[in-house]
Amino acid sequence: MASESSIPLYDCLIIGGGIAGLSSALSLVRTLHTAVVFDEGIHRNDQAPHLATVPTWDSQDPKRFRDAAKLNILSKYSTVEFANVKLEKFNKALGKPFLTKVFGHDYVVLPSKYFDDIKRASPQSLSFFQALSDGLNMEASVGHLYASTTEIDVVVKHLNPRLTQLTPLLCDEAEYAIEREVGALPDWKKFNVSNLIAAIVHRTTNRILVGKELCRNEEYLAITTKFSRSLFISGIFWNFVRLGPLRKLVAWLTIGLHLRDRNAAAKVLLPHVLARRQEKEAGVDVATKYPDALQWTIDTAPSFPGDDEPLHQVYHMLHLTFAASSASGVGVTQCLLNVLAYPEYLEPLRDEISTVVARHGGWTDKALSQMALLDSFIRETMRLHPAGSFMDDHFRFHDGLTLPKGTNIIAPALAIHYDPDNYEDAHRFDGFRFARYRQKQGENHRWLASTIDQKFLQFGYGNHACPGRFYAIRKIKLVLAKLIMDYDFKWAQPRPVHDRPEDFAIEAQLVAAPDAEILIRSRNLSN
């Protein structure tokens, strides 16, 4: 075994997948750790020498591991396929971590016994945004924007406390978005489900982010969609290229497409920021006039030099849009695919929604909170179709396990969600599973779709879980509920009952099948 004293310490980068995925990336920046050493599967790690002795998932053939991770970018082989097997071999049977490659970086996959240590890790030791910035090469387009806590402050201090009052605005925009993207359909019409839901959710999300005027500005909607797409593509792609220390330099030189989209989006948004700043200086009650994240960003005290500059505030809004729209869109898409695959749930869901809305006199926040069957359906969908096969959570551990600064650490979310020790009949979709749990065990809040625990990692875990999950679940509920109340659905090409298109994996990132097509028809207009 290697000596601990011979292993150097490095600055840490921790990257993860997911909607939450994106919003739960953390970086270990303060605490020094020494190395953990194992006997099995020794190999030399070219990116992180301090992890040279951690076993890989394919310990007998490390080259096969590297080729799969670096070359087969779209293959499930390097992530989804081995997750359950290696959870059993290392995480469960031995209680040990193992090493794998995700998005071009080496990661130590942790057993769940370390999650309580993760939960207690302080914000002073874990930096939310720096890892995300490094992983997506964001410094090339927005500099050190992610050294700021502005986006977290906007969500935690402004958005979350106002969610009850904001629900009617979300409802109004969801109705408008569905009318624009679907409309009245007396006859069946074919849609690509991922594209349709992405458009609806993007519109709905922006009502709370930038207000009614901008969220219905077709130019702004189009360019922010392009911005989000090019941000992900330009950021992720270069993590797979074998350029070693030159990778970051090449990423800087080839980011032109994303910079074009960033500048086009900023051109539309910047005048609104400047106008609101002028109104605020003139004494206008902007907090009441503009109940949206754009105004909260302007009002938030700067946490990093430059945060109070108009262009920085524009960039913060664009990146909030990127995080908030994509995650919820995938969530609604996965749920809608399950509505088609498991039609036995449709009428009970419709009955609950109509009853609760009538009881509360409309689509209020209280009404959404009492849709227990819908909430369970969403949580069960997320359990079986999480945003990533791995999620990132981290820190110093109770049993003496230590890792050096520089260690990327993730949790095997997909394997944990499918573990029969965690869920009865774990591989079967049971849409009302968590509604029964809430009744039987009398723990109403424990099993909500927005509640996190060691067995449900859709939004991360502990103090560093996604702070926007409460907003995300409200959007998913509203859009999904309104769709299933107003429309009928069927597959564009007939499928057996309980069969649905397979998820698409971009390494650890899981999304609903991008080519899935469905037919939609209005319920009250059908011929």
Curated annotation (Swiss-Prot):
Pathway: Mycotoxin biosynthesis
Matches recorded under Gene3D superfamilies: Cytochrome P450, FAD/NAD(P)-binding domain
GO MF terms held by the record: heme binding; iron ion binding; monooxygenase activity; oxidoreductase activity, acting on paired donors, with incorporation or reduction of molecular oxygen
Coiled-coil residues: none
Annotated positions binding heme: 466
Recorded superkingdom: Eukaryota
UniProt keyword list: Heme, Iron, Metal-binding, Monooxygenase, Oxidoreductase
EC number assigned by the record: 1.-.-.-
Record carries keyword Oxidoreductase: yes
Broad enzyme group: oxidoreductase
PROSITE patterns given in the database record: CYTOCHROME_P450
Names of required cofactors: heme
BP term (GO), one: secondary metabolic process
Family named by the database record: Belongs to the cytochrome P450 family.
Role noted for this protein: Cytochrome P450 monooxygenase; part of the gene cluster that mediates the biosynthesis of aspirochlorine (or antibiotic A30641), an unusual halogenated spiro compound with distinctive antifungal properties due to selective inhibition of protein biosynthesis, and which is also active against bacteria, viruses, and murine tumor cells. The non-ribosomal peptide synthetase (NRPS) aclP is responsible the formation of the diketopiperazine (DKP) core from the condensation of 2 phenylalanine residues.
Name by which UniProt lists this protein: Cytochrome P450 monooxygenase aclB
